[in-house]
């Protein structure tokens, strides 16, 4: 159902697993040590030596391993919106970073909607209510949503620190009373909201997490390295679909203006070495919109808004075989 840019044929979802897998390539000793330790039979990911400099990490792993080059990694064209869904498949419609700009979006047919965060500008209750109304107008059987760094009110620790400040960093948010944001998640009545939690729909185990590397002091920001790794360690093995707000290193995380890779190294190692989901959906980096695959996981940056906050990127459609036990 996907047409890879290096192959004139049509590539179905299950065929991605037959591509040369990144796990089969040579890994440096430091990388292997970062993921080889076991505890009670579980593979333990450790902080990568290049954690604090993702651009350097990308360069190192590319030069020494070709880790982000064909045939280990391929760009993939998503399913056309008007393509018929194969029998026995579930159609996922993936969006992210809509930033309260949902009116122009043409939503395609599908079974499950995934929104990877930044559905508001600041997480104001009025914005959340408007987003929830939009969700209610959509016909999908399931709608699964996580927060992003713009959903400030969803990060309770962030809000507790914000209202203590003497200056108004986010004036419209910092003036909110606790009773107006402490249960802001409850405003999302038309979806399944995930925050370091999982749900099973149609037989797919789906896990969602809002955290990303520090980004100018917004919501759900954490320092690179151990702090983020502790969040990724919460992701259970056996997850079919992973939703995070930010990207892993090397996958749709390039920021041309800064000439930098900004993805999380620990998230990459967690995804490729331990969790190995079939689908990883994220956003955050508006410039990275698109689809890639590494032979095990399909990576989707579903950012609807461009870097100039224009909602012109269409939703990305992914078809996956429905588990037989669903």
Curated annotation (Swiss-Prot):
Its EC number is 3.1.-.-. It comes from the Eukaryota. InterPro entries: Calcineurin-like_Pesterase, Calcineurin-like_PHP_ApaH, Metallo-depent_PP-like, UPF0046_metallophosphoest. The keyword Calcium does not apply. One of its GO terms (molecular function) is hydrolase activity. Keywords: Hydrolase. It holds the Pfam family Metallophos. Belongs to the UPF0046 family. May have metallophosphoesterase activity (in vitro). This is Metallophosphoesterase domain-containing protein 1. The lineage of its organism: Eukaryota, Metazoa, Chordata, Craniata, Vertebrata. The gene is Mpped1.
